[in-house]
């Protein structure tokens, strides 16, 4: 017969593990979807548009005795603007700071373009690396095996996983491996914490996601959302004021929409999701302002968690 004290002693004897796992890949490979799947909650915005993740977002998951801190880095691509350069630099910096690197490849696209460039760049990164092939349910197994072999010829990956971030297939195997692979040590964060992103910033990211989803190709990436006011009210609700910054008057008209239709839809969708996360009523007020060349303002980069490139 085992007593409660004996069970507690046995549990205490199992060493805890913790570490940082950088998830890198080309834009739209499914990194944010996978992070949200592995963490079990929304910590990173998802849209069909590329380059939606701008800074490193940490999602925190507990699996067995391990605390796994995922770093959802911006997609790596050929930079053209100052903001692009900052995002790519941040992604590679996150990879080099991690205990382990997970390269996510879209199996449908294979190794070409940005994915090939990333593989070459990983040759100079000395952290342990694993390969994760995403969207495997859309590709023949024979082609998946060829893709895995080709990637492993370029970089010596410790393991190769085949998953679907959308359905969760194969994700449990990834978590089992990471929980055993990370170094022994105390947990970095409280057990109930799922992200180190401040709520004000997460709320702004949610609004930015709804902006992308609503406007599709109409609004360029020259937009930025800031939470300017956060008021906890006596009735238990929260009043949030956010500003959507764009670079030109023509972009402001697109964000507002005819008769304010677009901004109302964006506000409704964002308010609903923020309220669900906070588990309290939310009053969200959105304003659209023109700030010319905000993409060249060092202060805006700091607010996004990015270093300002020279």
Swiss-Prot record:
Region described as G1: 25-32
Annotated stretches, region: G3: 72-75
Primary location recorded for the protein, binned into one broad class: cytoplasm
GO MF annotations, alphabetized: GTP binding; GTPase activity; ribosomal small subunit binding; small ribosomal subunit rRNA binding
Region (G4): 134-137
Domain KH type-2: start-end pairs: 215-292
Region: G2, residue numbers: 51-55
Complex and partners: Monomer.
UniProt similarity note: Belongs to the TRAFAC class TrmE-Era-EngA-EngB-Septin-like GTPase superfamily. Era GTPase family.
Name of this chain's protein: GTPase Era
Native source species: Sinorhizobium medicae (strain WSM419) (Ensifer medicae)
Gene: era
């Amino acid at each position: 017969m085992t007593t409660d004290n004996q069970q507690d002693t046995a549990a205490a004897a199992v060493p805890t593990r913790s570490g940082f796992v950088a998830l890198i890949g080309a834009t739209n490979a499914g990194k944010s979807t996978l992070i949200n799947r592995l963490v079990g909650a929304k910590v990173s915005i998802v849209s069909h548009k590329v380059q939606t993740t701008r800074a490193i977002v940490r999602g925190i998951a507990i699996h067995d005795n391990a605390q796994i801190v995922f770093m959802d880095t911006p997609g790596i691509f050929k930079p053209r603007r100052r903001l692009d350069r900052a995002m790519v630099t941040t992604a590679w910096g996150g990879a080099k700071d991690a205990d382990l690197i997970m390269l996510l490849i879209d199996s449908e696209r294979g190794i070409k373009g940005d994915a090939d460039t990333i593989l070459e760049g990983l040759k100079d990164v000395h952290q342990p690396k694993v390969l994760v092939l995403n969207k495997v349910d859309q590709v023949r197994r024979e082609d998946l095996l060829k893709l895995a072999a080709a990637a492993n010829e370029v970089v010596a990956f410790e393991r190769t996983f085949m998953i679907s971030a959308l359905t969760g297939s194969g994700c449990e195997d990834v978590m089992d491996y990471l929980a055993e692979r990370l170094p022994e040590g105390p947990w970095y964060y409280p057990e109930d914490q799922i992200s180190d992103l401040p709520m004000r910033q997460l709320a702004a990211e949610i609004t930015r996601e709804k902006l992308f989803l609503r406007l599709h190709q109409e609004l360029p990436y020259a937009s930025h959302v800031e939470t300017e006011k956060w008021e906890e009210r006596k009735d238990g609700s929260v009043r949030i004021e956010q500003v959507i910054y764009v670079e030109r008057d023509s972009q402001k008209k697109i964000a507002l929409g005819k008769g304010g239709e677009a901004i109302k839809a964006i506000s409704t969708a964002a308010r609903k999701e923020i309220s669900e996360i906070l588990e309290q009523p939310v009053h969200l007020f959105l304003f659209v302002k023109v700030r010319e060349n905000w993409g060249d303002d060092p202060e805006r980069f700091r607010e996004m968690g990015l270093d300002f490139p020279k």
